[in-house]
Amino acid sequence: MIDRYKHQQLRIGLVSPQQISAWATKIIPNGEIVGEVTKPYTFHYKTNKPEKDGLFCERIFGPIKSGICACGNYRVIGDEKEDPKFCEQCGVEFVDSRIRRYQMGYIKLTCPVTHVWYLKRLPSYIANLLDKPLKELEGLVYCDFSFARPITKKPTFLRLRGSFEYEIQSWKYSIPLFFTTQGFDIFRNREISTGAGAIREQLADLDLRIIIENSLVEWKQLGEEGPTGNEWEDRKIVRRKDFLVRRMELAKHFIRTNIEPEWMVLCLLPVLPPELRPIIQIEGGKLMSSDINELYRRVIYRNNTLTDLLTTSRSTPGELVMCQEKLVQEAVDTLLDNGIRGQPMRDGHNKVYKSFSDVIEGKEGRFRETLLGKRVDYSGRSVIVVGPSLSLHRCGLPREIAIELFQTFVIRGLIRQHLASNIGVAKSQIREKKPIVWEILQEVMQGHPVLLNRAPTLHRLGIQSFQPILVEGRTICLHPLVCKGFNADFDGDQMAVHVPLSLEAQAEARLLMFSHMNLLSPAIGDPISVPTQDMLIGLYVLTSGTRRGICANRYNPCNRKNYQNERIYETNYKYTKEPFFCNSYDAIGAYRQKRIDLDSPLWLRWQLDQRVIASREVPIEVHYESFGNYHEIYAHYLIVRSVKKETFCIYIRTTVGHISFYREIEEAIQGFSQACSYDT
């Protein structure tokens, strides 16, 4: 088994046949070595027990039930007094049944088989190392043609081929004729090589260091040559140089990881533990089996057939043997990666078999679904909605999600306050949703942050911590300013919520991951908590005001015409004099009493420095009063002067929206200044 404390990473690579044998074989107490799967059977149809030496054999993979052998005998696991440690009749050890989750077996292949990942996947590692075309290697692997072994001292087939050329145009077609001759098997095995065995021989003869040296020399020679002037030839040179670089890198990787190239050709085929390819009984007594079991059975059937052809009959035609070797190669290819050679293999219901590659790759594969992104406890998921009244570091959790996430903490609180005698009573109170439950839940949530995450997590700000509060409904409320870090919007996006359990995780969430501590982008340093989308539209509406300017009166015929056009569409609108207010509180109060609108223009008394008023600006209008005072009306402000031209007061032309926006900014600045003064 993999120790989680010693092993912190997982890597897929090549292993030697000796390592596969060490993983799969075991010695039972009577000295017998078991581990090889020789029969393509699973369960006996009468006894419903695993077949001996089959794909679910209890001698190889361990007992189905802990401490119970195939005969039905029982022994206490771990008891030193119990003797023997295995059943002498069936050979099953008395161990825990969990061994069937990691105990492997193996199939001893009669002929070598190339691993399809290293042959057909692009780039082809076997083709790169041998520096041969992929089509040529495929023809050799699948027994479409053969090649002669180099033998110098003895007569070879190459020396005899001249006598057949007058009858057969191509001498390679004469090889199958020799294969059908009785007693020619010795000569054939000595001189003719085909299938994956031929690939294995060539890979075993490779010297990786010489490959690196020769490739480097050729790469330098190609680099010294200048452009040929022919575009096609120049492209061929560039492709050849790229190939040489890949070949050198591949050879260096094999040397660095102590991997032999011939390991890409399999002699022993590992068999997965039975719990990873189960057979399940469903309603009605029917059995459901993993597709991998059927693919393993196909491999064993064809391998046993090849063994019988080679051992039982010496007069077997060579073409039949080559055809059976090809079937074994195709069966192993289908087991490892169904459909990689073209049309995938299907069952009787025209359903594609799910191979080993299909099990581990993709979003629903073993790695991404179970190992990397598996679902965890103390987590939930829901749609996010905007929470404008929330603080930047807070989020709103629905009651339904919060009570599930913090259920254990609420149970502990109920028991500590002697409101429940045990866990069962506490759970019943939670199901009944008593008021005391929500009070304890709020106390728990005040001291416990939560983590919000939106997939995909492309950078550090994709997961941040927040202080949760209870909200009604079934959606998570989020402050709109933190959306840019998550790359989220409120059109149906979902976010996951997690509860940090350990003290270290809670400390990290509070000190490093709170949203108000991540205001700048970690990549470029720009502010990331800035208004976007709906907030910008809201600010525009809040500060837009009315389209009628100060000159919209009878003295300006253009604006008067526009005003008359507006009255056509807004028949309920009645022009009124713009009101005057002494302070912002009176203006906001009038808006709340619905005396004015949000974008209605008004005059607000303002403490404005005279120096900011342009001296050359000419007033648009001047209104005189009976006592001699007069009003100078400008584009955006109004000055009240006395007869002696002394300034009494200044009014600015604004709206309630502008006033509200200004007050929010002023309060935020004052709060920030107070916080800074407290820190100093």
Swiss-Prot record:
Binds 1 Mg(2+) ion per subunit. Binds 1 Zn(2+) ion per subunit. It is found in: Plastid, Chloroplast. It holds the Pfam family RNA_pol_Rpb1_2. Its main location: plastid. GO terms for cellular component: chloroplast; DNA-directed RNA polymerase complex; mitochondrion. It catalyses: RNA(n) + a ribonucleoside 5'-triphosphate = RNA(n+1) + diphosphate. It is an enzyme of class 2 (transferase). One of its GO terms (molecular function) is DNA-directed RNA polymerase activity. Gene3D superfamilies: 1.10.40.90, 2.40.40.20, RNA polymerase II, clamp domain, RNA polymerase Rpb1, domain 3. Belongs to the RNA polymerase beta' chain family. RpoC1 subfamily. This is DNA-directed RNA polymerase subunit beta'.
